[in-house]
């Protein structure tokens, strides 16, 4: 969920990594369509779709929107859709505060593995440090 800057970067990275299917969701239809068009042009092998009717069969659900952050809607997807979330799905959220967002708490209660926003941010900081030369490449994995 979320097709802005963060969500776009995550979607692009997943497509570069070789996923075959990607479902996109954003509250703004124009933002969703722009990302869909860019991904379709660069990754024609990826089957793109809008919000699915079920989460059954998905390997990964990522919130790349501010949903769950203080002052924003608590869940990035409709509750009825989240009720279809299987325990085998990994759920990640980019929101850094609170550490465990309502989405992650819901997923954890369903038995899913989760990745918090701070965990995702730390991984990006290591990569950025390597990119600018502040962290030697060999230390990046252990840092």
Task: Please give the residue ranges for each predicted region.
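A short, charged, Gly/Pro-tolerant segment at domain boundaries
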Residues: 139-143
């Amino acid at each position: 969920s979320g097709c802005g800057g963060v969500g776009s970067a995550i979607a692009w990275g997943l497509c570069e990594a070789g996923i075959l299917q990607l479902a996109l969701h954003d509250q703004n239809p124009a933002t969703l369509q722009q990302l869909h068009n860019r991904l379709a042009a660069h990754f024609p092998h990826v089957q793109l779709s809008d919000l699915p009717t079920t989460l059954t069969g998905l390997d990964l659900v990522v919130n790349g929107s501010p949903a769950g952050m203080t002052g924003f809607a608590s869940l990035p997807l409709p509750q009825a859709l989240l009720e279809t979330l299987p325990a085998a799905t990994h759920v990640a959220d980019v929101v850094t505060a609170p550490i465990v967002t309502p989405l992650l708490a819901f997923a954890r209660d369903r038995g899913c593995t989760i990745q918090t926003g701070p965990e995702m941010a730390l991984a990006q900081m290591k990569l950025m440090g390597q990119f600018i030369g502040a962290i030697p490449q060999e230390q990046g994995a252990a840092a």
